[in-house]
């Protein structure tokens, strides 16, 4: 059975981060285990030194007091002091490094299990909806074939049956029509419901991605803190451990926590240029050119389905316009809106836009069949190159809809580090995945509500100056004096001479 989740960009990034996180957890556990062994060695060594110091002290008590005995007494005191020092080091490692590490690892494990269960739950909903659609389609196809056979039986029996038998057949046909209508509606509703199910799964992946990312940052910070504590306690050993400590301190002084976080972000950044979500399209018996239906009945049935789609498309378009107006109102009058309202409205608009694309793809597919039946030219639609067919006992159709990937990017961390006063080298203009531009322009096709501090708010028709194009589907530019990121899928790039026209205007 085809897996609808395998090729999803969100899923790939989430799995890569999970693997990275697991490696980090294993590393942290190994470091903690080694520290525990070191603490045990220090405590056991301290006990041994203290026993020897006590034994030497008792020996000296029975000896005659002289300079030699006094010197050995200092040796005994030195052993006691060294024992205390090693014991304090062992206890400090246990208290300040091992205990916090166990607490963090335990909390992380519980959190990760909860996140993984949430992702698995929503993924199962997507797969269940996918399978339910195929099941409902199979059931609808069988019922349609039976209905057509009954219809032909009624048509062929008009002249040779009595009124009573004819009425009986008509009653059967009526029941069959009602049953067929219910199954058709059930199949259609499952297809439409796939939008919200898919979005819920992708939003869960995005939220879990951010949560695991925060856990990784916390783990990196923990290891850095442990190293600093270790360095402080080793340094009190005195001059005899200076050489060893210098090497450790030199290594610790080279630690750059922001560099580690930057490496983490680079490992987990979205590598695909766009995110494509695949949805099943409705496939009806009437679309099969080899079916037994007459062209008139095929045409009539397809037109009724197109009418239903058109009504839903018009409703979705009105909803989209309403949501756009709402977002514009939020931007213009910030006093009666908050970030959660804006985020919720933007999410609704994203879902509605996706639903509209699916409805239009279904409408285009049926319109193409209708045009072929009526011997008219085939209609044109942007999604025509994104519709695919494959066979698994039956022929299935699906569409891949392009959408921007909204996960947090590496620049967020770079900007945050810069604001803290730490300079992070900027990537070269020829680095992989980045295109440096002069003053290229693009025009906003749809409104976009910023979800992060480093993103731009877009209104339909805005002209944005492009500074950089990133491979993960986000561009960097400026609008009305503000610089930030925006999704490339929401804009169209203008020709180079448009810059002169815009500047003259």
Curated annotation (Swiss-Prot):
SMART domains hit by this protein: SH3
Protein location: Cell membrane; Cytoplasmic vesicle; Cytoplasm, Cytoskeleton
Domain REM-1: 292-372
Domain spans labelled F-BAR: 1-260
Residue spans crossing the bilayer: none
Family matches, as CDD domains: SH3_Nostrin
Superkingdom in the source lineage: Eukaryota
GO biological process terms on file: endocytosis; signal transduction
Phosphoserine: modified positions: 114, 478
UniProt keyword Membrane present: yes
Residue stretches in coiled coil: 101-128, 160-222, 295-332
Tissue: Present in pulmonary arterial endothelial cells (at protein level).
Keywords: Cell membrane, Coiled coil, Cytoplasm, Cytoplasmic vesicle, Cytoskeleton, Endocytosis, Membrane, Phosphoprotein, SH3 domain
Domain SH3: 437-496
GO cellular component: cytoplasmic vesicle; cytoskeleton; plasma membrane
Domain notes: The SH3 domain mediates interaction with NOS3, DNM2 and WASL.
Role description: Multivalent adapter protein which may decrease NOS3 activity by inducing its translocation away from the plasma membrane.
PANTHER family: NOSTRIN, ISOFORM H, PROLINE-SERINE-THREONINE PHOSPHATASE INTERACTING PROTEIN 1
Protein name: Nostrin
Organism: Bos taurus
Gene from which the chain derives: NOSTRIN
């Amino acid at each position: 059975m085809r897996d609808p989740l395998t090729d999803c960009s969100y899923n790939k990034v989430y799995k890569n981060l999970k693997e990275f996180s697991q490696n980090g957890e294993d590393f942290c556990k190994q470091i903690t285990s080694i520290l525990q062994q070191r603490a045990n060695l220090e405590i056991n060594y301290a006990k041994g030194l203290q026993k020897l110091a006590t034994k030497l002290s008792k020996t000296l008590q029975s000896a005659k007091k002289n300079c030699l005995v006094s010197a050995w007494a200092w040796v005994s005191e030195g052993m006691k002091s060294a024992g205390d020092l090693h014991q304090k080091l062992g206890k400090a490692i246990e208290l300040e490094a091992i205990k916090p590490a166990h607490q963090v690892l335990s909390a992380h494990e519980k959190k990760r299990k909860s996140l993984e269960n949430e992702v698995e739950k929503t993924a199962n909903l997507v797969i269940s909806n996918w399978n339910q659609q195929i099941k409902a389609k199979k059931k609808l196809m069988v019922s349609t074939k039976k209905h057509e056979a009954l219809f032909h039986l009624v048509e062929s029996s008009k002249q040779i049956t009595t009124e009573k038998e004819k009425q009986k057949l008509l009653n059967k046909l009526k029941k069959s029509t009602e049953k067929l209508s219910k199954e058709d509606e059930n199949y259609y509703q499952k297809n439409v419901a796939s939008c919200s199910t898919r979005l819920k799964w992708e939003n869960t992946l995005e939220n879990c991605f951010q949560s695991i990312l925060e856990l990784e940052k916390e783990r990196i910070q923990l290891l850095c803190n442990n190293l600093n504590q270790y360095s402080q306690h080793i340094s009190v050993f005195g001059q005899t451990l200076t050489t060893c400590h210098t090497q450790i301190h030199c290594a610790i002084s080279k630690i750059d926590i922001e560099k580690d976080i930057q490496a983490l972000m680079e490992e987990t950044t979205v590598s695909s240029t766009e995110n494509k979500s695949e949805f099943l399209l409705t496939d009806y018996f009437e679309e099969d050119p080899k079916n037994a239906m007459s062209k008139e009945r095929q045409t009539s049935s397809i037109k009724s389905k197109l009418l239903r789609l058109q009504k839903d498309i018009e409703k979705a378009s009105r909803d989209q316009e309403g949501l756009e107006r709402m977002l514009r109102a939020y931007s213009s009058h910030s006093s009666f809106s908050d970030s959660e309202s804006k985020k919720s409205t933007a999410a609704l608009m994203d879902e509605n836009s996706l639903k509209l694309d699916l409805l239009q793809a279904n409408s285009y597919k049926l319109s193409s069949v209708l045009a072929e039946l009526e011997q008219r030219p085939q209609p044109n639609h942007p999604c025509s190159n994104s519709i695919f067919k494959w066979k698994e006992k039956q022929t299935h159709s699906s569409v891949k809809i392009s959408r921007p990937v909204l996960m947090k990017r590496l620049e967020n961390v770079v900007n945050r580090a810069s604001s803290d006063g730490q300079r992070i080298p900027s990537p070269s203009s020829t680095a992989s995945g980045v295109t440096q531009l002069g003053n290229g322009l693009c025009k906003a096709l749809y409104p976009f509500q910023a979800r992060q501090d480093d993103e731009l708010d877009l209104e339909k028709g805005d002209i944005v100056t492009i500074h950089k194009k990133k491979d993960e589907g986000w561009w960097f530019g400026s609008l009305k004096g503000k610089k930030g990121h925006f999704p490339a899928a929401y804009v169209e790039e203008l020709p180079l001479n448009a810059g002169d026209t815009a500047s003259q205007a």
